[in-house]
Amino acid sequence: MAGEIPDLVAEPRAGTGKGAARQARRDGYVPGVVYGGGADPQPIQIKFNELLRRLKAGRFMATLFNLKVEGQEDVRVICRNVQRDVVKDLPTHLDLMRLRRTSKVNLFIPVEFINEGAAPGIKKGGVLTAVRPEVELRVTAGDIPESITVDLTGLDIGDTVTISSVTLPEGATPTIDRDFVIANIQAPSGLRSADNEADEEETEEATAEEV
């Protein structure tokens, strides 16, 4: 997410606790709190429709925002949690953490696969299995990547893609200190079944010869 930081407009929220939060929801807002950055927690509220629009747009939890609250200095924040109604799945509360543009933060970044048509394994009918459709990376708050790209060119059935084989965005590092698998190309189910049957026949023949 390099480039201009989008604004997130909020209002100060009077009072804390369940009663104040319920009142905010009745008034058409989603209550929240801003914390971190060496300052006291600040109760806020965001218009329900505006928050819902941003959530539907995607990547809300992976976007650095410029929080604007009337009468206060702008502050950069990232959302760390959105609570939802268990029945309606609508937002009921959110937590925002203060950050500087140079701050480091751990985020799950989606994986994008390209050049499937240039993968011999897929041409043969192999199946691309995304073991990790998202990868947790430590990134700079002011330069959060949209995704990490995995190039499938040249991959055959049985090949795997590990984190060490992927070119990560500048400044991004994995949070897991091992060479974990992101994806692999598996044989088609029909071929796997045929291979299993062949293995069983070979085992039976070997057993018969021993007898």
UniProtKB/Swiss-Prot annotation:
<dbReference type="GO" id="GO:0022625">
    <property type="term" value="C:cytosolic large ribosomal subunit"/>
</dbReference>
<protein>
    <recommendedName>
        <fullName>Large ribosomal subunit protein bL25</fullName>
    </recommendedName>
</protein>
<dbReference type="Pfam" id="PF14693">
    <property type="entry name" value="Ribosomal_TL5_C"/>
</dbReference>
<dbReference type="InterPro" id="IPR029751">
    <property type="entry name" value="Ribosomal_L25_dom"/>
</dbReference>
<keyword id="KW-0699">rRNA-binding</keyword>
<feature type="region of interest" description="Disordered">
    <location>
        <begin position="1"/>
        <end position="23"/>
    </location>
</feature>
<keyword id="KW-0689">Ribosomal protein</keyword>
<keyword id="KW-0694">RNA-binding</keyword>
<keyword id="KW-0687">Ribonucleoprotein</keyword>
<dbReference type="InterPro" id="IPR001021">
    <property type="entry name" value="Ribosomal_bL25_long"/>
</dbReference>
<dbReference type="InterPro" id="IPR020930">
    <property type="entry name" value="Ribosomal_uL5_bac-type"/>
</dbReference>
<comment type="similarity">
    <text>Belongs to the bacterial ribosomal protein bL25 family. CTC subfamily.</text>
</comment>
<comment type="function">
    <text>This is one of the proteins that binds to the 5S RNA in the ribosome where it forms part of the central protuberance.</text>
</comment>
<feature type="compositionally biased region" description="Acidic residues">
    <location>
        <begin position="196"/>
        <end position="211"/>
    </location>
</feature>
<dbReference type="InterPro" id="IPR011035">
    <property type="entry name" value="Ribosomal_bL25/Gln-tRNA_synth"/>
</dbReference>
<dbReference type="GO" id="GO:0006412">
    <property type="term" value="P:translation"/>
</dbReference>
<dbReference type="GO" id="GO:0003735">
    <property type="term" value="F:structural constituent of ribosome"/>
</dbReference>
<dbReference type="InterPro" id="IPR020056">
    <property type="entry name" value="Rbsml_bL25/Gln-tRNA_synth_N"/>
</dbReference>
<feature type="region of interest" description="Disordered">
    <location>
        <begin position="191"/>
        <end position="211"/>
    </location>
</feature>
<dbReference type="Pfam" id="PF01386">
    <property type="entry name" value="Ribosomal_L25p"/>
</dbReference>
<dbReference type="GO" id="GO:0008097">
    <property type="term" value="F:5S rRNA binding"/>
</dbReference>
<dbReference type="InterPro" id="IPR037121">
    <property type="entry name" value="Ribosomal_bL25_C"/>
</dbReference>
<comment type="subunit">
    <text>Part of the 50S ribosomal subunit; part of the 5S rRNA/L5/L18/L25 subcomplex. Contacts the 5S rRNA. Binds to the 5S rRNA independently of L5 and L18.</text>
</comment>
<dbReference type="InterPro" id="IPR020057">
    <property type="entry name" value="Ribosomal_bL25_b-dom"/>
</dbReference>
